[in-house]
From Swiss-Prot:
Record-linked HAMAP family: RibB (MF_00180)
Site entry (Essential for catalytic activity), positions: H126, E164
Binding site for Mg(2+) 1: E28
Organism the protein comes from: Agrobacterium fabrum (strain C58 / ATCC 33970) (Agrobacterium tumefaciens (strain C58))
Gene Ontology molecular function: any one: 3,4-dihydroxy-2-butanone-4-phosphate synthase activity
Protein name: 3,4-dihydroxy-2-butanone 4-phosphate synthase
Binding positions for D-ribulose 5-phosphate per the UniProt entry: R27, E28, D32, R140, T141, G142, H143, T144, E164
Quaternary state and interactors: Homodimer.
Catalytic activity: D-ribulose 5-phosphate = (2S)-2-hydroxy-3-oxobutyl phosphate + formate + H(+)
Cofactor remark: Binds 2 divalent metal cations per subunit. Magnesium or manganese.
Cofactor requirements of the protein: Mg(2+); Mn(2+)
GO CC term (a single one): cytosol
Amino acid sequence: MTIAKIEDAIEAISRGEMVIVVDDEDRENEGDIIAASDSITPQQIAFMMNHARGLVCVAMPGERLDALDIPLMVSRNTESLKTAFTVSVDYIPGTTTGISAADRAKTVRALVSEGSRPEDFARPGHIFPLRANPEGVLGRTGHTEAAVDLCRLAGKFPSGTICEVANDDGTMARLPQLEIFAERHGLLVVTIKDLVSYLKGEVVEEMVQKQVA
């Protein structure tokens, strides 16, 4: 299986499908499943829980987290890659303990719903929002930023639900295993490196258009 084009991943996400995004070998060298938060389903959450096995998180813009009064988990981040975890949350209306796939999907969709208010969420909970760098992957080449950028490019709310992919033995899946996993489940694989190149191309194109205008 070959690495897919960024354009194909954008189209897949716009249709509500999941994709796998891989970062650089000299970074985490891991793959995350990404799906648009505004159309996430219980079935997609269950797939992440059963097959990917990582932590289900929601990559979000900082302004949305501020609007919901969801602060960073710690004031001083000492994690190696500075992943910006916030306080975990559960959506209260219409959910039970918050941990089921259905409850988690409700929480994710509520996080990106304009009608949600800070008091609608219990803290701590079972969904972990992540605060994305405001410059996206051009500011930080993480899965958090890739999820936000891809969903924005797909015309969705700029928030992606993400989950790391692990092997059956609990080790983290790398590119060879990720390609096998993707082929088995019919998912596209793209790289953050290609997403950075795609976005840099967009920036250059915008600059050229402004100069022509």
